[in-house]
Design a protein with these regions (language model features):
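Glycine-rich phosphate-binding P-loop
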Residues: 1
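Conserved, well-ordered active-site substructure
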Residues: 5-7
Length: 189
């Protein structure tokens, strides 16, 4: 039986678009002991803000590059790219302790690990691919995972939304030869 531990102690998330409706637990996790990068600061109450958090940019704001601006006016200006200016960088992030998450499992820090019953490779696709489907066996699942394609995000250099081959939806994190990486997955099964 395969057991797993979580080698991380928290969540690293993209801030823009995260709100109480889109991801309540992620937002709740950021309420204390959290590091934010490249978000806007609401100078009136010393809180953070990003696009998609709510529809009310702070009037007294410091945008992600450090300029003090009226957030409502700033976000209504169309930039050189033909889009409204952003108070937060499109790839702004938060890092929050997992213990802050309202739904964290009591087994989260079990030193013996927890039994694995499924592995999900989470690529980003706006269309044409089912959100979830099940493989026939470990080898088939490894093959399917290796064939995942994802659309680029603000985290990647270049245009956003471009489809690229993204093995196991882990391309930015595969630190060695991808063939060896795939062989490792096959060997584990």
């Amino acid at each position: 039986r395969l057991y797993a531990i979580n080698p991380e102690n928290g969540f690293f998330g993209v801030a823009p678009g995260t709100n109480a409706k889109s991801n309540y637990n992620a937002l709740a996790s950021t309420m204390k002991n959290t590091i934010f990068t490249n978000v806007a600061l609401n100078n009136a109450d010393n809180t953070v803000w990003w696009e998609g958090l709510d529809k009310n940019p702070p009037e007294d704001a410091t945008e992600w590059k450090g300029a003090k601006v009226n957030g409502k006016e700033y976000t209504s200006v169309i930039g050189a790219d033909g889009k409204p200016q952003k108070l937060a960088h499109p790839n702004s992030r938060f890092t929050a302790p997992a213990v802050n998450c309202p739904c964290v499992s009591p087994e989260f820090n079990n030193p013996n690990g927890v039994p694995v019953s499924a592995i999900i490779f989470g690529g980003r696709r706006a269309s044409t691919t089912p959100l979830v489907y099940q493989s026939f066996d470990w080898t088939h699942g490894t093959y399917i995972g290796s064939a995942v394609s994802s659309e680029t995000t603000a985290a990647a250099v270049g245009a956003v939304g471009v489809l690229r081959h993204d093995p196991m939806a882990m391309k930015p994190f595969i630190g060695y030869n991808v063939g060896d990486y795939w062989a490792h997955w096959l060997e584990m099964g």
